């Protein structure tokens, strides 16, 4: 997705272990998260002492190779975030209810100038369980991103241990490559 030295943005990142994995491969990580406690735990687990500064209405936790913005992701601006080479959406789109997803997809485009994305979604019978994570069908991924990105499904697999007590859950991994011109 992005090589060493690339800056990867993880929206609604929480304290995912993927951050340490990316940093271990030389990526610079930027993230956004609503839960301050999760970010404090993340930095403790990474054994990093962040510098905490204001970024508009957000707090910015920074250390070598990592910047995490705490607060409402919709308050994050391109000026706060800075340049991004790629987006890794592991659990953000599926965390949002349907009425917010279109706004979110547009916000990511405006934040990053349409950086390429790796997106992970789940599909299941939404009537059987409330989200989050919410079920996001393949046609919705195409509707949200197809006008601005070439949408390619890389892999589809059943979630082995299910999700939310459901046994029939499918995980889809998508690559979104910006359409240029």
Please name every model-derived segment.
Residues 88:
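A conserved beta-strand element that flanks and buttresses the S-adenosyl-L-methionine
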């Amino acid at each position: 997705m992005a090589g060493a030295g690339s800056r990867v943005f993880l929206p609604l990142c929480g304290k995912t272990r993927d951050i340490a994995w990316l940093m271990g491969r030389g990526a610079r990580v930027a993230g956004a998260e609503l839960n301050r406690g999760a970010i404090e735990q993340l930095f403790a687990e990474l054994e990093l002492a962040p510098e905490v500064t204001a970024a508009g209405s957000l707090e910015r936790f920074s250390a070598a190779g990592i910047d995490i913005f705490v607060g409402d992701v919709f308050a994050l601006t391109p000026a706060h975030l800075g340049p991004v080479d790629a987006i890794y959406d592991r659990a953000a789109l599926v965390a949002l209810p349907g009425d917010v997803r279109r706004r979110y997809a547009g916000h990511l485009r405006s934040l990053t100038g349409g950086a390429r994305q790796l997106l992970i979604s789940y599909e299941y019978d939404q009537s059987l369980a409330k989200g989050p994570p919410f079920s996001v069908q393949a046609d919705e991924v195409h509707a949200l991103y197809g006008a601005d990105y070439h949408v390619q499904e890389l892999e589809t697999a059943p979630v082995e241990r299910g999700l939310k007590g459901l046994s029939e859950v499918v995980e889809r991994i998508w690559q979104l490559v910006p359409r240029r011109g």
